[in-house]
Amino acid sequence: DPNVFASVYSTLVTQLTAGGAKGVVANIPYVTSVPFFTAVPTNPIPGLPSASAGQLNTLFGGINAALAGASLPPRFVTLVADDGNPATVEANPLLIKDESLPNISAQITAALTPVLGGPTAGYVGSIYGQARHASNAVASRDYILLTARAVIGTSQTGAPSPFNTIGVSYPMQDNTTLTASETAEVKTATDAYNATILALANSKELAFVDANAALNQVANGGLVYNG
């Protein structure tokens, strides 16, 4: 809460400067410049074996069709198979869970029951009801937390094959990802916090470091000295 932050930060700075002490304060960088949120790309999955790619594309194509039937946009892209050429690098997006999406578990189950049978279709519906492929588009960019790297491509305990590969056929959980809407909310809060920090730096005559601008420059080309 920006108001709580303003109250706590103001109290802290007032206490630290009560005896006439001077110092330096820095603001807070945007998460879009912090390596913890940017080091893992949205498409770290290499080209898949042809059979796996075909199987998943059929499944995700069926779900996209169910989405279209519900007048909802598609959530899955066509996955790329490994072409066997070591000179080329294929990349596929992560499969993630987005809790902001309408849950279409029931629609998926109904659409796939004639093909997969009730139990399997029910399971598929339960794990893909709010699943989608991660986006790298500017307007809808997802950010994958660095801690997620350790689980990408591993097997989800208790999930049956072939629906158990995390980030490929089993969705990364919501707490491993910042969606575009969540990133926008964090930016709004960061702007409010930084306004408080700058105002207090000015009122208390403290030196101010714009860490947000500096890290943004590092993230977008780097800092250049003497050249």
Predicted regions and their residues:
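Acidic, Ser/Thr/Gly/Pro-rich low-complexity segments that form flexible
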Residues: 31-203, 211-227
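Mobile, glycine-rich extracellular loop/lid and propeptide segments
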Residues: 1-12, 21-30, 208, 216, ...
